[in-house]
Regions:
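Left-handed beta-helix
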Residues: 1-10, 18-20, 199, 208-268
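Conserved core of the sugar-phosphate nucleotidyltransferase
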Residues: 128-203
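A conserved hydrophobic position in a structured secondary element of the catalytic/binding core
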Residues: 59, 196, 245
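Active-site acidic Asp-centered loop
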Residues: 122-123
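N-terminal nucleotide-binding beta1-loop-alpha1 segment
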Residues: 1-32, 43, 48-50
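Short phosphate-binding loop-to-helix
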Residues: 66, 73-115
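Short aromatic/hydrophobic "clamp" motif used to bind/position activated sugar donors
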Residues: 119
Length: 268
């Protein structure tokens, strides 16, 4: 039996792809003419042996629900696995309160009911391939509380401006998580991908709700890094990586992969 279940989270509040996101979730965007963006995180999970996956849907769910169906096209075994779509209860007061923590808290019973000891959390708006089974093994071997995946770039001044960055020490320990403000070109872009125990994940959800209704999972982990309460490690990703955070990044990612050599870094 595999050690972990998967969570595919919806896009953050500050991300908006003009002209497209008003009609469908980013995960439902067409990509390269034959995929949807959400195919990448789900395929990463199923190809890594993760068969129990929760997909969090924030808004405009119809096209996403139609595409995902029962998950059979991802080779999810319906007897041993499940592709579960979960919806959040939106705050009608202000969208600023509709955080990932709020989504998880609204569906806490579904998380608690899962019998796997570890969880892999990935976003629905980033394009990359990786083997999560190796990431989980590295996490367990390190003894860290949380493992975070990052990609080192040299163009952070102009790109990835809606992403987080990781500040690391020499041992790849995470010192802090910050927004990329475009003030340096070399940055470690956080890929919004976490590995941790289910028990710790649930405790972080409760802690974030106690601290602030505005807190995200990244916020509560960042607080733990700064206070020394959490041992958080970074793992570097190799290969193609794109973050779909606006129309330009969506267009550029599609254009990048026309080049066969670039495409090989994603699909090989």
């Amino acid at each position: 039996m595999f050690k972990a279940f998967g969570i595919v989270n919806s896009s953050e509040r500050n991300i908006h792809v003009e002209g497209l996101q008003d009609y469908r979730a980013i995960g439902a965007f067409s990509f390269l003419g034959r995929y949807r963006v959400i195919d990448f995180p789900i395929s990463n999970m199923t190809n890594s042996g993760i068969e129990y996956i929760q997909v969090y849907v924030k808004n405009k769910p119809r096209s996403l629900v139609e595409h995902l169906g029962t998950g059979r096209h991802y080779n999810i075994n319906s007897k041993s696995g499940n592709l579960q779509l979960l919806f959040s209860e939106h705050s009608g007061v202000n969208d600023i309160y509709n955080t990932d923590i709020d989504n998880y808290y609204s569906n806490l019973e579904c998380i608690e009911a899962v019998h796997y000891p570890y969880v892999v959390i990935a976003p629905n708006y980033m394009i990359y391939t990786t083997d999560y089974s190796k990431l989980i093994d590295a996490h367990i071997e390190s003894g860290a509380d949380v493992t975070m995946l990052y990609h080192s770039v040299d163009n952070a001044k102009e790109n990835y401006l809606n992403c987080h960055i990781l500040n690391l020490n020499r041992q790849k320990g995470v010192l802090s998580i910050e927004h990329n403000h475009g003030n340096a070109k070399n940055r470690n872009i956080f890929m919004d991908t976490y590995v941790m125990s289910k028990e710790l994940f649930i405790s972080l959800i409760h802690k974030a709700k106690e601290i602030s209704s505005l807190y995200t999972l990244a916020d509560v982990i960042n607080a733990g890094c700064r206070d020394g309460e959490l041992d958080v490690r970074g793992v570097s990703h190799r290969g193609y990586f794109a973050s779909i955070t606006d129309f330009k990044s969506y267009h550029d990612a599609n254009m990048d992969l026309i080049n066969i050599k670039t495409a090989q870094t994603l699909f090989d």
